[in-house]
Amino acid sequence: MDCIRILWSVAVGLLLVSWRPTMFAASPTCDTVQNILAPCAGFLTGQEPSKACCTGVNNLNNSRKTKADRVAVCNCIKELTKSIAYDPKRMPLLSTKCGVKPDFPAVDKNLDCSKLPV
């Protein structure tokens, strides 16, 4: 009987160790962020956001579960925006236009992503 309990405990322990819920998934990669935000390029230069843009913003927002996720996404956005002409004041408007909370920060070259609020 004790042997069965030990085996059962080991089996449950292995299941718990091997189970990786979403909250433990890695932060989104910059390639993922770029693909998600690609439909928003027009918005960042003055147009209205498309449905695809808002869907992407909502998906990206849902992937930013931890401060590390938010910092990673912010740094990716900073890197991506180096290569396009855009109005950094429009970035936070994505949240309003697409109905997303929390707000996206105004990302520019001077933003220290590590100091974003929790």
Curated annotation (Swiss-Prot):
UniProt-recorded Gene Ontology molecular function terms: lipid binding
Paired cysteines (S-S): 30-76, 40-53, 54-98, 74-113
Organism superkingdom: Eukaryota
Gene Ontology biological process terms in this record: lipid transport
Pfam families xrefs: Tryp_alpha_amyl (PF00234)
SUPFAM superfamilies named in the record: Bifunctional inhibitor/lipid-transfer protein/seed storage 2S albumin
SMART domains reported for this sequence: AAI
Keywords from the named record: Allergen, Disulfide bond, Lipid-binding, Signal, Transport
Signal peptide: 1-25
Family to which the UniProt record says this protein belongs: Belongs to the plant LTP family.
PANTHER family with a match to the protein in the record: NON-SPECIFIC LIPID-TRANSFER PROTEIN 2-RELATED
Function: Plant non-specific lipid-transfer proteins transfer phospholipids as well as galactolipids across membranes. May play a role in wax or cutin deposition in the cell walls of expanding epidermal cells and certain secretory tissues.
Protein's recorded name: Non-specific lipid-transfer protein
Organism: Ambrosia artemisiifolia
